[in-house]
């Protein structure tokens, strides 16, 4: 089994997930359920014997809080953590902070669906998934992947769309395929990589 370990975790449920709001770069914390999800992720990783050498996180509170709870469960609170805006959620621009139902009333269901689920169409003032990939992928290639290939066991805690961008590259998925991929909050996805950075194995640690 490969020692080139990469674990991806979407943050626990956020306050705005619960309220059905577009969040993007807005900065709500996680809910009580989100706290439970993060702690559960940490317990599952600990039960499987995971110990990490490197940790990466976005600049947003919901991801940072999730990672801190995971590391607490692992007894690794002293592990250095690198945070970067490159791992932030997709910026929803003018949709940020709006209730998703209200947005559908304002712009129409079809238009909002296009903004949410097309690869290269951005909402007003915001990013498409393609835009998100354009900032997330270089950071992965330059900052995260080299350590993984050296055998550093690495955890990345981020967001639905920034993680979709990484998964698209890791699993060599088409834009159509990645847009259909739903990522549960607080569920670790375990990748073991080959020396050429392709995926040897993948496991969802749902418990």
Curated annotation (Swiss-Prot):
Pfam families tied to this protein: His_Phos_1 (PF00300)
Keyword Isomerase assigned: yes
A Gene Ontology biological process term: glycolytic process
GO molecular function terms listed in the Swiss-Prot or TrEMBL record: phosphoglycerate mutase activity
Record carries keyword Membrane: no
Alphabetic keyword roster: Gluconeogenesis, Glycolysis, Isomerase
Residue positions binding substrate: 10-17, 23-24, 62, 89-92, 100, 116-117, 160-161
Membership in a protein family: Belongs to the phosphoglycerate mutase family. BPG-dependent PGAM subfamily.
HAMAP family: PGAM_GpmA
Subunit and interaction comment: Homodimer.
Listed name of the protein: 2,3-bisphosphoglycerate-dependent phosphoglycerate mutase
Source organism: Afipia carboxidovorans (strain ATCC 49405 / DSM 1227 / KCTC 32145 / OM5)
